[in-house]
């Protein structure tokens, strides 16, 4: 029996105030775009009529403007989890208008299954193909699709997006683990292993309709690297090469996980162009253009990811050359791509971005000056805590030098000193392995802080009260406070904070 075709507007009309939506995708890759855009129109009309209309949003990670963006503008999001990068959403979260739950991405699907986040009313999945018996072939991301499709109480809506070629069928490995106490080992022992199906199986009776559309992904090209990011990339490559020469990293190398953005591109470029680095595997949550280039060059052998967060030109190139990629590229649900068991088993080298790092190696990767959410923790906690080698990178300064990324005490903590092995800026490398707090502070100031801030950070240590971890609590956030008052951390005078 053929599944009914409906319009995006008809699908949106099914969704009621207070419903919770579980969406496919992970980053803008693979996320619904047609139905959510129509849902924003519904919210606008309801609000104009004086009626409430807000929904809960559960996703794999961030979405694009046609979801988080338009729904935020129309004040249509009551609650959302987890990670997001949308500017309109960010404004409203920081204004206290949206309840935002910043969950580790590996935990998202299981927290839904455990009932921690309430019921899922509707699942909306983007697909490149769907069969009458309910086999849904996802597009450019795995996300939380298997879980929300299975648990959706009111029904499943499929966006059949012609932009995505059905030639990509076969790159997904869809696997949903059992919940405790029945969960067993996840039998992935190398990045290319496959343990699931190539599709999400949905009870066809639950599919209320298929919305046909042809809408490109909303992934953005990252800005070009600059001398600072290039130097960070080179510092990372040099550090890893030194660890290889010491025999800490095996000569065959280890699978790499890297975040996204210009710094990640610079790191991958430096590793890929270094002849001393053997061809390596990638086990990550997000694949960007640089990895695809390295796969074409033979520098990356196999890549496992949750999403293809690439430009549309690169995505089309993958589809056109799918025979080159199908056996070397695996897309997984986020609870598998980010799974701590697998990360530790494979021995990943994890490289992620910090907003700020304090003198003892704690990392803030989510908040500006302790209060304003930037994006969220994403998968960085999944990877960094469980990796063979945990690396955080950042420029030593921001805002033209008015902010030091190295501070006495992080204004928000996402990754504790116990989970951070190495800190790298364009200034150098602080290898924190085996070091005491006092030793870490010395290394971070000397090797990672910008020269304009080194003396200020030494001055803080002079007034810090002695202990295992030396601090002066009245002055620990003096640099942040000075920035908020005067717009420049360099104007900090610790004497004003000593009582």
Labelled PLM ranges:
Residues 1-499:
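Conserved alpha/beta enzyme-core scaffold
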């Amino acid at each position: 029996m053929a599944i009914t075709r409906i319009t995006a507007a008809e699908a949106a009309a099914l969704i009621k105030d207070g419903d919770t939506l579980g969406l496919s995708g992970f980053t803008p890759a693979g996320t619904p775009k047609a139905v959510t855009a129509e849902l924003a129109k519904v919210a606008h009309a309801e609000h104009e009529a004086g009626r409430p209309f807000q929904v809960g949003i559960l996703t794999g990670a961030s979405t694009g403007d046609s979801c988080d963006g338009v729904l935020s503008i129309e004040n249509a999001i009551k609650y959302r989890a987890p990670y997001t990068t949308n500017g309109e959403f960010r404004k409203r979260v920081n204004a206290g208008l949206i309840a935002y739950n910043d969950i580790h991405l590996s935990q998202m699907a299981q927290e839904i299954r455990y009932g921690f986040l309430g019921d899922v009313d509707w699942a909306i999945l983007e697909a490149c193909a769907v069969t009458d018996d309910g086999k849904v072939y996802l597009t450019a991301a795995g996300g939380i699709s298997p879980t929300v499709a299975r648990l959706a109480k009111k029904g499943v809506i499929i966006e059949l997006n012609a932009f995505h070629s059905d030639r990509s069928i076969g790159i997904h490995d869809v696997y949903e683990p059992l919940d405790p106490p029945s969960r067993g080992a996840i039998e992935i022992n190398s990045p290319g292993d496959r343990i699931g199906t190539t599709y999400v199986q949905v009870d066809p009776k639950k599919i209320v309709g298929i919305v046909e559309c042809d809408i490109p992904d909303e992934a953005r090209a990252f800005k070009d690297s600059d001398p600072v990011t290039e130097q960070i990339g080179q510092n990372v490559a040099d550090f890893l090469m030194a660890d290889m020469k010491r025999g800490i990293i095996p000569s065959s190398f280890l699978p790499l996980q890297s975040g996204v953005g210009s710094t990640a591109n610079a790191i991958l470029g430096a590793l890929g162009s270094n002849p001393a680095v053997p061809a390596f595997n990638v086990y990550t949550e997000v694949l960007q253009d640089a990895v695809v280039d390295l796969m074409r060059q033979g520098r990356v052998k196999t890549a496992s990811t949750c999403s293809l967060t690439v430009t549309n030109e690169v995505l089309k190139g993958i589809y056109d050359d799918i025979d080159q990629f199908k056996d070397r590229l695996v897309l997984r649900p986020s609870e598998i791509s980010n799974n701590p068991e697998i990360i530790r088993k494979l021995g990943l080298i994890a490289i992620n971005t910090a907003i700020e790092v304090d003198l003892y190696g704690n990392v803030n990767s989510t908040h500006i000056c302790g209060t304003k959410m930037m994006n969220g923790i994403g998968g960085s906690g999944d990877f960094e805590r469980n990796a063979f080698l945990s690396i955080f990178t950042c420029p030593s300064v921001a805002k033209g030098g008015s902010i030091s990324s190295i501070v006495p005490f992080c204004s928000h903590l996402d990754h504790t000193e116990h989970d951070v092995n190495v800190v790298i800026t364009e200034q150098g490398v602080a290898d924190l392995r085996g070091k005491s707090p006092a030793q870490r502070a010395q290394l971070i100031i000397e090797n990672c802080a910008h020269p304009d801030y080194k003396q200020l950070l030494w001055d803080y240590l002079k007034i810090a009260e002695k202990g295992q971890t030396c601090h002066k609590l009245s002055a620990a956030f003096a640099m942040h406070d000075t920035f908020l008052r005067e717009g420049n951390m360099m104007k900090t005078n610790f004497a004003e904070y000593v009582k």
